[in-house]
Amino acid sequence: MTNIRKSHPLMKIVNNAFIDLPAPSNISSWWNFGSLLGICLILQILTGLFLAMHYTADTATAFSSVTHICRDVNYGWIIRYMHANGASMFFICLFMHVGRGLYYGSYTFLETWNIGVILLFATMATAFMGYVLPWGQMFFWGATVITNLLSAIPYIGTNLVXWILGGFXMDKATLTRFFAXHXILPFMIAALAXMHLXFXXETGSNNPPGISSDADKIPFHPYYTIKDILGALLLILALMLLVLFAPDLLGDPDNYTPANPLNTPPHIKPEWYFLFAYAILRSIPNKLGGVLALVLSILILILMPLLHTSKQRSMMFRPISQCLFWILVADLLTLTWIGGQPVEHPYIIIGQLASIMYFLLILVLMPVTSNIENNLLKW
């Protein structure tokens, strides 16, 4: 008799994706982030569900309802901070996951990679809309600034902004629609994640040296299930340390002031995970140019398969490319730092140089270096 795990129409899908999946024997901890992202998504949907039970999407009561959750709802404070800091953990895992893909050449799985880029955009959109909901000062002004960027689009820009905001300014209509869209997007992300997984399972995982692992496969369970559980425990440990010891470390003090359309904060900045893109946006003095650079800074990921000139897939045996990769990481950290600084003398020029460096590294230096490495190896 066949095992029910392998014959049942639903169970065999789970079996082929998480139990009997043939996995390379040599994948490192950098391959843990996919499962961690899944855990983050489930955690965000669950905490979000409980928050939505007590939250009111109305300009008059939104701020008070969040305060009420923290003060009066049983364990409301921990649910709220797990949701807020869960987003930070989500983005840390996302950046690590994308960085792994860049380093080990995983972008040669085109469908998986492209769905991944769409997932990144969807997650950023969700985080942005969720950011507005507590209706604090920085939430309000951050959203006002970012939505107004759309007015830079020629011909339709101004109408588009008014259409998204549901009026001339951020108001009750905006808050309601952002809440609705923030509630539905995570489920679209979950559906996309399943597609991402289906395509990844179709080709099999990549591995550190970037070579075929068909000759040496091991079952996903128990080897990688136990490894993923360890990763999950470390993720939850990090999240709970943040939630219980420094819940506001990554937030902005301005958000403890209710939104006031008549009072602009001195330095408007988004959450830390958008700062690198915000720095690129600010470093270009032209509005439309800035918006284009902002979108391209993430959309450039789609070009990665086209920019791959090396005869080797992974960077494991390419020391010069490795140097450039880590320079790119340092550059992104610099941009993140600059995005949180005021627009004044030393920061402006540093931001502009870091932005130029970002595009130069990806579009010019890395492909050229790959060619040089091919020649050095006489390939």
From Swiss-Prot:
Residues that hold heme b b566 according to the record: H97, H196
GO biological process: mitochondrial electron transport, ubiquinol to cytochrome c
UniProt keyword list: Electron transport, Heme, Iron, Membrane, Metal-binding, Mitochondrion, Mitochondrion inner membrane, Respiratory chain, Transmembrane, Transmembrane helix, Transport, Ubiquinone
Topology of this chain in the membrane: Multi-pass membrane protein
CC terms in the record's Gene Ontology section: mitochondrial inner membrane; respiratory chain complex III
Keyword GTP-binding: no
Keyword rRNA processing: no
Cofactor: heme b
Entries under PROSITE patterns matching the protein: CYTB_CTER, CYTB_NTER
SUPFAM superfamilies hit by this protein: a domain/subunit of cytochrome bc1 complex (Ubiquinol-cytochrome c reductase), Transmembrane di-heme cytochromes
Spans through the membrane: 33-53, 77-98, 113-133, 178-198, 226-246, 288-308, 320-340, 347-367
Location(s) in or outside the cell: Mitochondrion inner membrane
Residues that, per the record, bind heme b b562: H83, H182
Cofactor note: Binds 2 heme b groups non-covalently.
GO molecular function: metal ion binding; ubiquinol-cytochrome-c reductase activity
Record-stated family: Belongs to the cytochrome b family.
Protein purpose: Component of the ubiquinol-cytochrome c reductase complex (complex III or cytochrome b-c1 complex) that is part of the mitochondrial respiratory chain. The b-c1 complex mediates electron transfer from ubiquinol to cytochrome c. Contributes to the generation of a proton gradient across the mitochondrial membrane that is then used for ATP synthesis.
Subunit structure comment from the entry: The cytochrome bc1 complex contains 11 subunits: 3 respiratory subunits (MT-CYB, CYC1 and UQCRFS1), 2 core proteins (UQCRC1 and UQCRC2) and 6 low-molecular weight proteins (UQCRH/QCR6, UQCRB/QCR7, UQCRQ/QCR8, UQCR10/QCR9, UQCR11/QCR10 and a cleavage product of UQCRFS1). This cytochrome bc1 complex then forms a dimer.
Misc remark: Heme 1 (or BL or b562) is low-potential and absorbs at about 562 nm, and heme 2 (or BH or b566) is high-potential and absorbs at about 566 nm.
Listed name of the protein: Cytochrome b
Organism: Litocranius walleri (Gerenuk)
